[in-house]
Amino acid sequence: MLTTFTAPAFAGTWYIEDGDITISAGESGNNVTQNKETTVNDHDTIITNREEGASSHTVTIDAKDKDDKVEVTLKDVNIDASSRSEAAVSVTGKGDTTIELDGDNELKSGAGHAGLEHNKTDTSGELTIQDKDNNGSLEAAGGFKGAGIGSAGSNDAQVKITGGNITATTSDDWGAGIGSGSYGTGTVEITGGEINATGGYLGAGIGGGCNGSGNVTISGGTITAAGSDGAAGIGGGYYNGATVTITGDAVIKNASSTKYGAGIGGGNGSDGNVTISGNAKIENATGGYGAAGIGGGAFSSPDKIGNGNVVIKDNAKIDNVQGGAYGAGIGGGIYGLSNVTIEGNTKVNATGGAGGAAIGGGAGAENNSDNNGNQITIKSNENGSPTINAVGGGTDEGEKIVIGGAGIGAGCESNADADITLEGKVTITATAGKDNVAIGANGIEQEFSGLAEGSSITRYDPEGNDITLPTDPVPAVPSSSGGGSADASVQESVFPGLVVTDKDGQRISYTSIRGNNVLSLRVGRFTASLRASLATLRQLRAEGIDTITFQTILCSTSLSVDELLAMGGEDTEVVLTHHIRSSALTVGGKAV
């Protein structure tokens, strides 16, 4: 027999130890049922524990009709429903439910269920978790196939979080920390709070469970998210992709995957579609084995390759992003291509996994069926100009990776092209992995022209030698103060006493850059020779120059002036010749 009490404006505290609780929308408040007794018009429904230990009783919130609004406060609740194979708290119905967090709350559900469960359907309402007083926390653990917060197994999920200190995980496998259980789509919106989410085996930290996709928008809060094997930290679960938007003032402290999933993006064998904008900040994103830090997951089969489609814009900052072995820092997983756009007042620091590009393709990628390779655009706009530091992935003897990745472009053992576009004002430092290029693909350093004043491109080989092309824009000359000379000078023709000749022995012009005690000479040829007498070098040494660097398109050599001066008399000629990637030095006609 069900007993109903009718009362005006009732504010009730309900103790979970007294029995299961069901809450629905009434005419002017909540209808709360416990032990077959219903109280109506409850305007401040608070659910709590009378004692410290966990209760196995559950809470069901049913905003049944489309216009229903149900608001419930969880205050120091501790529910463990794992023995009942039920959800500790479940939210259903076509209407909207808001859960306020007060105090410390713990929810643990049984197999097949989420810790705090909301299964999304075509007609379901919205679940919002909030912490208006900034004094609430929630620890939620799902059972086998269920998310920590989100859906049960084989269901889609919808969750919106606006605040609270929230820790979400699964006590078993296949579910996301926040998002969907297995085989579902996790639709997650986070606008605030301090979030720590860990996926179960094959589940994303935030996004999709096993075989589940992620549809994630984060516009605020501080986030730490870890995906388990095959799943992204933020994004897709095992065997599924993701659409991830990080914007506003969101801070991603760390997003990572143990293996095969991107830090942010796709799960194993899946693409990652990621947009980072506004004032968002990524402090660290790390891809699992074979996956990108931001972008595509690892290769699974010929028809399941993790490509990375990434846009970074506005004032976004990427402090550190690291690809897993074979994966790009930003772009494709192993065998995966990239479509990356970086624009505006952005700052990016990216490193490729062993064999992967820092920004671009994963190792072993091929052009797609339309014969398109990696597409990379870096440009300024009305918001400002980008600053990029890109370090190509190195080698790994244990993985038999003997060639590194490009700083910007293609990964190792890749036949994929790299269509790289630079527009406006850019500041780029790119370091090549072993036997790869700093910026480009297929062994060719790409040249650029028409960039705006103030642009800078600096290229390094893996040993840190400057291999900047003579055609690259150089850093702006520091302005002097107090009438003193600047620290660096640029001369667009020749430096007195130093002659550069082409392959036919004809004199050609070059660019000379003096910075402190180093004189750099740059020429846009594959083959060229630098010629100088020891008398000229002695004069340079008297002016404070102790090192001369000679740079052609694919080769850079540094010479010690003191060592050369010890090799002969004043009239002795020094000739340094570059041909493609090789160099040869003679002093007085003798090879050194």
Regions found by a protein language model. Name each.
Residues M1-T4:
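Bacterial N-terminal signal peptides
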Residues A7-S480:
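A composition-driven surface/loop motif
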Residues I46-N49, K69-K75, D80-R84, T92, ...:
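Long, contiguous ectodomains of secretory-pathway proteins
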